[in-house]
């Protein structure tokens, strides 16, 4: 039988989808080459309302395909499944299986049971059954991998539904994490992202407050690992020893995603974020003093209940001061069951939209100005997989700088995902850069692995097509 997994939401879900694919293939399922398959798995997100709406809209489209015989079974997992449970069957009785965030490994058995009994099956666990990293995995990338160091979250942010769906923080032992990274590197992986809901509280379960900084140093020392990243930290628990470890460990990339959410102390207090703007700015200042070329990115929520124009101006002022390389900006979305959803002074949508547009305009200007500083500089890129299959043979590629910036460039030599290329930047836009023809190329074992997994006709691969310079 064939399968496909559609993923909504955050990096946690992307990594969970790799595990879902792994347990299915371990049972003999084969990945479909299209969006249609015998089994369609939807790995859902519950963080914002628009994710809910998109999911239920897609379920309606799948009904027609199921009636036409193009799909045999539909399974729904992830945070929305954990939250809505029986509601999914009420809204979409054609769904066959609903499973939660804590029991990914149960999916094959639930699918078998549903086929045998010709009934819908639901299994939601309220506690972690098996740590996801102990399950089989099917990774899409030959050069980059997620490695989970913890699951769950002990914070109580008033806008966030994740702790109630993912549970309290559970930490993996350092030895297990390092062993997984070593195994990945032996398979050709060059880049690892350490993944957790709040990575810098890693170690809380075994009482070691310096555990995350120590983990960075030990992981970065693994021979063959060229790039090491992590996401996401929390400003309240972020400490100097992590910045020191980033500075001292060559493999750790000069990039830091530090969620702000708001620049207003009053709103941060209402969000129950446990830090204030001054603490945030102190972290940024220390990071830049110790790692001058570091790129800082962030998350910002616009329109939190009770946000005044003065509060919003505090956010704009902080954004202008910090000058983020990029920012994930969101309009506040009330989630049922969270304290913020029942707070007074919910902000009208037109005001939220107007503020959101102003923030986006400011951040885009800053991102463009920061990117323009790179024009004329030479940067080393990790070649990544592009999205335009019709331009895979025209010697145009895409890659990421150590700071995480996206660069489109040309190369007269054949490149594979996982190879490295050095280019000179000739053009900048807010969200990407353009490089001249590659100056040097470094082929890697990761590129060799890509060749082994792909036929030679597509081996010239990775171009997106060069954006026009306007």
From Swiss-Prot:
Chain sites annotated for binding [4Fe-4S] cluster 1: 10, 45, 79
Record keywords: 4Fe-4S, Cytoplasm, Iron, Iron-sulfur, Metal-binding, S-adenosyl-L-methionine, Transferase, tRNA processing
Subcellular localization(s) per the UniProt record: Cytoplasm
EC id: 2.8.4.3
UniProt superkingdom: Bacteria
Assembly with partners or alone: Monomer.
Stretches assigned to the Radical SAM core domain: 139-369
Cofactor: [4Fe-4S] cluster
PROSITE patterns: MTTASE_N (PS51449), MTTASE_RADICAL (PS01278), RADICAL_SAM (PS51918), TRAM (PS50926)
EC primary class: transferase
Species the sequence originates in: Tropheryma whipplei (strain TW08/27)
Catalytic activity as recorded in UniProt: N(6)-dimethylallyladenosine(37) in tRNA + (sulfur carrier)-SH + AH2 + 2 S-adenosyl-L-methionine = 2-methylsulfanyl-N(6)-dimethylallyladenosine(37) in tRNA + (sulfur carrier)-H + 5'-deoxyadenosine + L-methionine + A + S-adenosyl-L-homocysteine + 2 H(+)
InterPro entries hit by this protein: Elp3/MiaA/NifB-like_rSAM, Methylthiotransferase, Methylthiotransferase_CS, Methylthiotransferase_N, Methylthiotransferase_N_sf, MiaB_methiolase, rSAM, rSAM_horseshoe
Protein known as: tRNA-2-methylthio-N(6)-dimethylallyladenosine synthase
Cofactor note (record): Binds 2 [4Fe-4S] clusters. One cluster is coordinated with 3 cysteines and an exchangeable S-adenosyl-L-methionine.
Primary localisation category: cytoplasm
GO cellular component: cytosol
Gene Ontology molecular function: 4 iron, 4 sulfur cluster binding; metal ion binding; N6-isopentenyladenosine methylthiotransferase activity
Pfam families linked: Radical_SAM, UPF0004
List of residues binding [4Fe-4S] cluster 2: 153, 157, 160
């Amino acid at each position: 039988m064939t399968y496909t997994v559609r993923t909504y939401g955050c990096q946690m879900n992307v990594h969970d989808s790799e595990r879902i694919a792994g347990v299915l293939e371990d049972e003999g399922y084969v990945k479909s080459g299209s969006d249609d398959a015998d089994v369609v798995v939807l790995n859902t997100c519950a963080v914002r309302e628009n994710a809910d709406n998109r999911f239920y809209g897609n379920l309606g489209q799948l009904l027609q395909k199921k009636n036409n015989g193009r799909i045999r079974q539909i399974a729904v997992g992830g945070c929305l499944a954990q939250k809505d449970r029986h509601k999914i069957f009420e809204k979409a009785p054609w769904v066959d299986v609903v499973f939660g965030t804590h029991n990914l490994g149960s999916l094959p058995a639930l699918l078998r049971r549903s086929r045998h009994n010709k009934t819908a099956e639901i299994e939601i666990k309220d506690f972690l059954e098996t740590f996801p990293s102990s399950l089989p995995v099917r990774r899409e990338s030959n050069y980059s991998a997620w490695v989970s160091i913890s699951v769950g979250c002990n914070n109580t942010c008033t806008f966030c539904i994740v702790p109630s769906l993912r549970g309290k923080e559970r930490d993996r032992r350092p030895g297990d994490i390092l062993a997984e990274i070593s195994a990945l590197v032996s398979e050709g992986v060059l880049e690892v992202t350490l993944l957790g809901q709040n990575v810098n509280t890693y170690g809380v379960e075994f009482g070691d407050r310096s555990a995350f900084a120590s983990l960075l140093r030990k992981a970065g020392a693994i021979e063959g690992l060229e790039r090491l990243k992590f996401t996401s930290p929390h400003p309240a628990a972020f400490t100097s020893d992590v910045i020191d470890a980033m500075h001292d460990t060559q493999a750790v990339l000069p990039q830091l995603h530090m969620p702000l959410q708001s620049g207003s102390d009053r709103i941060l207090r209402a969000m129950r974020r446990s830090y204030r703007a001054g603490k945030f700015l102190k972290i940024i200042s220390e990071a830049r003093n110790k790692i001058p070329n570091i790129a800082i990115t962030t998350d910002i929520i616009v329109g939190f209940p009770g946000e005044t124009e003065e509060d919003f101006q505090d956010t704009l002022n902080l954004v202008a001061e910090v000058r983020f390389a990029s920012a994930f900006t969101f309009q506040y979305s009330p989630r049922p069951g969270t304290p913020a959803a029942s707070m007074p002074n919910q902000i009208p949508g037109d005001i939220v939209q107007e503020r959101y547009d102003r923030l986006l305009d400011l951040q885009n200007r800053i991102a463009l100005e920061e990117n323009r500083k790179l024009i004329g500089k030479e940067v080393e890129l990790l070649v990544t997989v592009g999205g335009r299959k019709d331009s895979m043979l025209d010697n145009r590629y895409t890659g990421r700088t150590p700071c995480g910036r996206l660069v489109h460039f040309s190369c007269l030599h054949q490149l594979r995902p996982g190879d490295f290329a050095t280019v000179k930047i000739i053009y900048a836009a807010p969200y990407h850069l353009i490089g001249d023809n590659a100056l040097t190329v470094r082929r890697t074992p990761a590129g060799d692995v890509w060749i082994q997994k792909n036929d030679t006709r597509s081996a010239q691969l990775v171009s997106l097509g060069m954006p026009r310079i306007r």
